[in-house]
Amino acid sequence: EGDFRIYTATVGETVGCTLQAEIRSPAGSRAVYRGELALPITGTLNGVHPWSIEHPTLYTLTVKLIRPGTSGLPDRVLDEKTVRFGFRTVQFVAGGLYLNGQRVVLRGINRHQSYAYQGYAMPDSLQRLDAQFIKKDLGCNAVRTSHYPQSPAFLDACDELGILVFTEMPGWQHLGDDPWKAQALQNCREMVCQCRNHPSVFLWGARVNGSPDDEAFYKRTNEAIHRLDPTRPTAGAHIRRREQLL
């Protein structure tokens, strides 16, 4: 069985509107659920196939914002959004990482999304090519997006190929003043909102890469991330010994 909980956010006039959520399996079966804007849509699907490194099964969710018809007029779809997702569990214990209850030995690399002579603005096809190199040529099962959230196309490819992703808040070594930290916290929130539907993402980077310790600030980044996603653990990358874990 696969449990799900669908949260939505809207902007604009939505009084009287309702939601319709449709989940489609890879085999084409459909399940439709209706709900209200103020509450999450929850449910359980039977016979789901979990997302894993060996079998990265993806389901498709389409959510529609509907204004009910009046005076004999039909309902009207005001907006809709389609995303892919997967059913899986991730847990770190003393013995290591467990994906869907099975222990996984991580073999991964750090990845920058810049290319010689072209920089960062590369098409989706090259983002996918990098993911294929990581999985099929290098034999890796994990990647760290060092050290910033990367192209949605790269995460899509990791979802499809079965690559675990450690994605991080942007930054490198530097910690700034209070306005800088306020923006960094917003970056953390945006990272979670942008990436949390990707089943490949198993770890949030809540620390600026290679930065000095700042217990109060990193407590806030952890809280900001876990407020939006309590299901995934957080981590941080270090360059010096005897530093705090976060």
Predicted features along the sequence, with ranges:
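Active-site beta-loop-alpha junctions enriched in small/polar residues
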Residues: 111, 148-150, 170-172, 207-209, ...
